[in-house]
Amino acid sequence: MHDENPTVNQPASVFRVRAHNTAPDSENKIHDDKVAVKYGFREGLVPGVTVYGYMVPAILEQFGRGWLERGAVAFRLHLPCYQGETVVTRCDGPVVTAENENGSLYASGMVSMNEKSDGEPEVFPSYPLPEEDRRPVASAQTMVAGLPLGSIRQKLEAAEETAIPERLLSLANEILVRNFRMSPWIHAGSEVRHQRLAKNGQEIAVSGVIQECFERKGRKFAVAALGISVHDDAGQLCTVATVRHTFIYEL
C-alpha cells in the first residue's frame, strides 16, 4: 500500500469480487427481489454503499492509508448491480471505477487527497429524531431544501480498518430512513471527504440537512449534506467526514 499520491508510472490497482446483496430484508424494498422486479429491475439491487465498499481496496492501494484520514471521493452509480455478479474495481490515479465483466459501469468517480489547509468543515447542529411511527412519508411536500435532519448516534463497528469508509457512508442511508419513510428508494451517488481517522469502537454522531431537491426524467431526487463526528480525547466534537449524499426518493 502506497503512502502518497499515485505517480504517473504507478500501475492501476485492480480487484475482483463477487457481488452480494447485503440488504435483502431492509426497510428499503428496492433490495427485495419481488419489489425490484415491479420497478423494472431483474431482482433486488446490491446496495450502492456496498458497491462503494468494493472500490475502497483499490483506492487504498493507490493512495495509501493516509486516504482514510484526509482522502476524498466523488462517485456516481450507473448500472444496477445484482447478487452473484463479478465486480471488477479499478483505481488508476484519480479515476476509480466498478465494472461488470463486460466493461459496463456500475459506478465511476474521482479520488483525491484533501489539503491540510482546507480548514475545518461545517458543523451541523444536532436535532431530535422523529418517533419511528411518526416519520413523514418522503414526498415533494416533506423533502424540502433547508430541512434539518434528526441526528443519529451509534458505535462504529467495522470488520477491519479498510471497511470503515463503507460503514461511515452507510450512516448516510441510516439517517435518511430514521427521518423519513421511504421505500423503495435508490442511492444515486456520493461525495465523501475524510477529515481525520475514524476508529472502531468510537461513538459516531451524524447530523445534517436536506441541501437540494430536484426532478429528473420524472424521478424525484434529493441531496443530503451530512457531518459525521466523534468526540476527541479532550471531549470536543470533531468531524471525521463530510458527505453529500444524492438519492432518488420517488422512482
Regions found by a protein language model. Name each.
Residues 159-229:
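Structured core of small recognition/catalytic domains
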Residues 1-19, 77-140, 197-251:
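HotDog/MaoC-like acyl-thioester-processing domains
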Residues 2-70, 116-189:
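Hot-dog-fold acyl-thioester-processing enzymes
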Residues 71-75:
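Long, charged, glycine-rich C-terminal linkers/tails
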